[in-house]
């Protein structure tokens, strides 16, 4: 695999994806971010078996492929790179070489096949809501969400779509 992306788009996607990386786990693959460049877009995926995040990164795919890299190490490397295009290249031994200008990092990876993929959600009903409206809906109801996870049922919000109306 070989991809080229701007540092800023990589950093943004990795920092968003880090929110679904568990701090402690018995499954080391969950500490990784899956870089999937097997289609015509570059996807970054993380999953802690409760929360999964997938982001799409703008960039160029020169060679298709997939690899799972330690998310925190990848974040620290990208954060310290100069503001320029970053190249991530992998080999058959699952080693990733990250280069940007004169900087070059080599980190071990894991097979993307071992990664816990996100479930495919079939959409029965769809509704488009503006970002502002959704933010306001959440702002007006967030006070009722439990602050701790002792009662998991109370840590989220319920959205219902009926007759093309979101409640």
Report residues per predicted region.
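Structural preference for solvent-exposed beta-strand-turn elements
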Residues: 1-167
């Amino acid at each position: 695999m070989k991809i080229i992306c701007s540092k800023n788009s990589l950093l943004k996607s990795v920092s968003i994806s880090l929110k679904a990386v568990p701090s402690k786990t018995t499954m080391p693959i969950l500490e990784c971010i899956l870089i999937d460049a097997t289609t015509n877009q570059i996807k970054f995926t993380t999953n802690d078996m409760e929360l999964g995040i997938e982001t799409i990164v703008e960039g160029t795919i020169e060679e298709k492929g997939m690899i799972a890299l330690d998310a925190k190490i990848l974040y620290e490397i990208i954060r310290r790179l100069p503001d320029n295009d970053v190249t991530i290249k992998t080999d058959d031994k699952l080693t990733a070489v990250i280069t940007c200008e004169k900087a070059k990092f080599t980190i071990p990876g894991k097979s993307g096949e071992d990664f816990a993929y996100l479930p495919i959600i079939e959409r029965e009903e769809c509704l488009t809501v503006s970002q502002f409206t959704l933010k306001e809906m959440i702002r007006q109801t967030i006070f009722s969400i439990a602050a701790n996870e002792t009662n998991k049922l109370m840590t989220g919000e319920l959205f219902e779509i009926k007759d093309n109306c979101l409640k």
